[in-house]
């Protein structure tokens, strides 16, 4: 028997392909901490965090508009399934997260679809999952888009999440003029 025949079979690893876009990425260096086009192997037991805090986040955005921890991804396995899935949780108190136009408030979470658009502020992430067999590891690979992903992929468009934190709270604010007495501020 040759060593080739004795070698362990290499398991295919699930990979999240994440294409990132921000309109100011070229001039501001927002993504300078992210290694593009390399597959990074991570244990499935790890909760992957995205944000601006370099001490707690795996992937850092150099932008004060981003929360210390913006969102997290965690691996899980559905009952009677042989492949891993991901859940996404909004960790930001100040900004909602949109996943395929479903709004997640602070600490809300949902299963991450196999292909989806994640958005907050001016950030756009196109996420595509490639299934693998490994239950021990998964990979993340980043690429950068120079064009808005919403337009490039004909995604149902909405405006960026406003500064007030969520679409629903901004829509309910009364923007019409109000009469105030001279002793009222």
From Swiss-Prot:
Sequence ranges assigned to domain FHA in this UniProt record: 48-104
Pfam families membership: FHA (PF00498)
GO terms for biological process, alphabetical: cytoplasmic pattern recognition receptor signaling pathway; innate immune response; positive regulation of canonical NF-kappaB signal transduction; protein homooligomerization
Family stated for the protein in its record: Belongs to the TIFA family.
UniProt note: domains: The FHA domain recognizes and binds phosphorylated Thr-9, promoting homooligomerization and subsequent activation of NF-kappa-B.
Purpose of the protein: Adapter molecule that plays a key role in the activation of pro-inflammatory NF-kappa-B signaling following detection of bacterial pathogen-associated molecular pattern metabolites (PAMPs). Promotes activation of an innate immune response by inducing the oligomerization and polyubiquitination of TRAF6, which leads to the activation of TAK1 and IKK through a proteasome-independent mechanism.
Protein name: TRAF-interacting protein with FHA domain-containing protein A
Organism of provenance: Bos taurus (Bovine)
């Amino acid at each position: 028997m040759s060593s080739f025949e004795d070698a362990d079979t290499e398991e295919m690893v699930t990979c999240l392909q994440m294409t990132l876009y921000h309109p100011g990425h070229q001039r501001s260096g927002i993504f300078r901490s992210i290694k593009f086009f390399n597959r990074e192997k991570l244990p499935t037991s790890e909760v992957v965090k995205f944000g601006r805090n370099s001490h707690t986040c795996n992937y850092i955005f150099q932008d004060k508009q981003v929360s210390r921890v913006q969102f997290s991804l965690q691996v899980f396995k559905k009952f009677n399934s042989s492949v891993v899935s991901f859940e996404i949780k909004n960790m930001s108190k100040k900004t909602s997260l949109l996943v395929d136009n479903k709004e997640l408030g602070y600490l809300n979470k949902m299963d991450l679809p196999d292909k989806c658009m994640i958005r907050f502020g001016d950030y756009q992430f196109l996420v595509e999952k490639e299934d693998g067999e490994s239950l021990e590891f998964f990979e993340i690979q980043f690429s950068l888009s120079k064009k808005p992903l919403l337009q490039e992929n004909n995604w149902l468009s909405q405006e960026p999440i406003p500064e007030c934190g969520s679409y629903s709270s901004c829509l309910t604010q009364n923007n019409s003029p109000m009469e105030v007495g001279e002793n009222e501020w």
